[in-house]
Structure formats: C-alpha cells, structure tokens
C-alpha cells in the first residue's frame, strides 16, 4: 500500500464517517502532576481539536486512571459552561508515566425519513418510519502524562477495541522527530488512515489535522511539527452491527500526549 504523509493542513471530508459524530478527547488545564494530590482533567467532545462543543450523556461515558494495570473510574460531572465533562484522579505513583482513559458507549443513530434520530432501528420501524441507515459509534481516548526518558509505562495496552499505543517514548520526541505508534483493532494489527494534530493548530476549523498517514500492519509514523498537546487518531467504520439495533459499528480512538 502506498503510504502518504501530508504535513500541510488537511480538511478532510470523511464520507464514511458522518460529520455529526464528535471526537472524544482528554485534556487537563495543567499537565504537571503531584503524587497523592488531586489532578483535574476533562473529557471533551468536538469536531475541532481540541475545542469542546458539547457535554456527552454522562451515563454513556467512563473516565479515570489506569493503576496497577486496571482502570479505576472517576466520578464524572457535567460542565455545561465549559461544554465538557470534569473528572479528577489522584496519582499514587509518579515513578512512571500516568495514563488516563475515557470511553463512550455510543447510541444507535438512525437516519430516517423524518431526519436523524437516536435509537434502535427496530423501534423506529415499529413506528412506521423508514430507516435509511443505523450506525453505532463507540469512542475511546487515552492520554499519557508524567512521561520521562526512563519510563516503561507509556506503551501500556489498555485493551480498547481500537487502541493507539506509542512505540516511541513521547518524552524522547522533539519537534522534527517522528513518533511511531502501533494500532490494534480487536487486538490485531490495524491497517487504515491515521490523523494527527496539536492543540492550537487550527481551532477555527472542523475535522482539520496537521498530519495524515496510513498504518500498515498495525504501525504508523507521525512527524511532530510543533511542541504542545498532540492527538493521534484512528477510525474503523463498517464493522458488523446487531440485528434490529444498528447496521454498522464504527470505532474511533485518540492517543494524546505532550511534546516539550
């Protein structure tokens, strides 16, 4: 497969991935952690990186810290003014990097003769509506904090159905370098598109990324073009659905980290 790397702005029209579905990301007001002290962070949902646009339904979202190889969920609070979800973690060990994770169990979204509606295909058909398509969007985000050059935890695999895992230690990456990541789809190597960008690159425009490439056999290389809070994104659409509920399952995943 021919690999394409584009360093200039990409405003991508993703025909297979409708624009009405937001991306799930994690951001913190301050990336510096202190051991044993509360660390605030947010789950954001938006088309623009990384500009919050809406508060997701709390019952569908989980967010927290990875400790001892396990996900420890935090209490979530809707922040209507900030258009995000607030949560707090308390890291116990800062000898290695700290991973925060967030997931959204997406609802079935149906396109009907009366417009877009949230719910199962069978329920709308029972109401006499014509359902043109029914898709479910599950989303995952993983953010790495407190990285160091001797860190061994940055490559921890959380176990998302679609997950981006750094092969290169983010602490070793500088502007002009490439970071290598492996991408797993249900535990197997992912082949497909990969997007990357950083906070402040193009906050005015939706679906706009600083870099594009393609993963081959589960591996992708992204050139870092600026310091800051970076996000690498992968997406898999068209997975088998559940009869009567939705036709296709679509997965989105973000890896987030700081480049100093």
Describe each PLM feature range.
Residues 8-16:
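Bacterial N-terminal signal peptides
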Residues 65-71, 195-212:
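Short amphipathic beta-strand segments in non-cytosolic proteins
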Residues 22-39, 117-179, 184-191, 202-205, ...:
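Beta-strand-rich domain onsets/edges
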Residues 56-58, 187-200:
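Short, ordered, surface-exposed loop/turn motifs in non-cytosolic proteins
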Residues 103-112, 238-244:
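Short acidic/polar inter-strand loop motif in beta-rich domains
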Residues 81-85, 208-228:
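Glycine-centered loop-to-beta-strand initiation motif
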Residues 22-79:
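Start-of-domain marker
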Residues 17-21:
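Sec/Tat signal peptide C-region and signal peptidase I cleavage site
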């Amino acid at each position: 497969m021919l690999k394409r790397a584009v360093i200039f702005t990409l405003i991508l029209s993703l025909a297979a991935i409708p624009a009405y579905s937001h991306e799930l990301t994690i951001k913190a007001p301050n990336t510096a952690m202190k051991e044993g002290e509360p660390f605030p962070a947010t789950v954001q949902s938006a088309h623009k990186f990384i500009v919050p646009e809406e508060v997701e339904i709390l019952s569908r979202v989980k967010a927290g810290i990875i400790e001892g190889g396990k996900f420890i969920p935090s209490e979530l609070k809707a922040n209507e003014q900030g258009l995000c979800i607030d949560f707090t973690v308390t890291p116990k060990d800062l000898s290695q990097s700290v991973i925060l994770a967030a997931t959204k169990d997406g609802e079935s979204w149906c396109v009907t003769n009366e417009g877009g509606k949230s719910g199962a295909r069978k329920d709308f058909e029972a109401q006499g509506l014509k359902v043109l398509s029914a898709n479910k969007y599950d989303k995952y985000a993983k953010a790495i904090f407190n990285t160091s050059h001797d860190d061994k935890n940055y490559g921890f695999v959380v176990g998302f159905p679609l997950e981006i895992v750094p092969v290169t230690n983010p602490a070793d990456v500088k502007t002009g370098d490439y970071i290598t990541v492996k991408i797993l789809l249900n535990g197997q190597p992912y082949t497909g598109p990969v997007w990357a960008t950083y906070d402040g690159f193009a906050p005015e425009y939706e679906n706009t990324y600083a870099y594009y490439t393609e993963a081959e056999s589960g591996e992708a290389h992204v050139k870092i073009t600026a310091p800051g809070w970076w996000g690498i994104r992968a997406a898999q659409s068209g997975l088998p659905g559940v009869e009567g509920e939705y036709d296709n399952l679509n997965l989105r995943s973000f890896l987030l980290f700081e480049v100093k």
